[in-house]
Amino acid sequence: MNQENPPPYPGPGPTAPYPPYPPQPMGPGPMGGPYPPPQGYPYQGYPQYGWQGGPQEPPKTTVYVVEDQRRDELGPSTCLTACWTALCCCCLWDMLT
């Protein structure tokens, strides 16, 4: 392959990216153009509150979360947790010193 002589391009060749635009009529368009009239748009009023035409939301349901079991009592699991914590702290202290 040569930089100065590339292989031929298969196909009809490049074309313009877009067709030319049709001529536009002069003067303002059917609605008076893209700009508002000099006196502004007429007042439409405030929007309605409440029903806006879309689907209504279902009523909200209150959900109460209740603990299954309180763990205020001192039992074997609390003692075991404290022992494991102390053992880990002792091992960590031993490694650091």
From Swiss-Prot:
Superkingdom: Eukaryota
UniProt GO cellular component terms: extracellular exosome; plasma membrane; tertiary granule membrane
Transmembrane stretches, start-end: 74-91
Keywords assigned by UniProt, alphabetized: Membrane, Transmembrane, Transmembrane helix
Transmembrane helix in keyword set: yes
Annotated region described as Disordered, given as residue ranges: 1-61
Biased composition annotated in UniProt, kind: Low complexity: 41-50
Cellular localisation: Membrane
Keyword 4Fe-4S annotated: no
Pro residues composition bias: residue spans: 1-40
Topology within the bilayer: Single-pass membrane protein
Main localization category: membrane
Assigned protein family: Belongs to the CYSTM1 family.
Protein name in UniProt: Cysteine-rich and transmembrane domain-containing protein 1
Organism (species): Homo sapiens (Human)
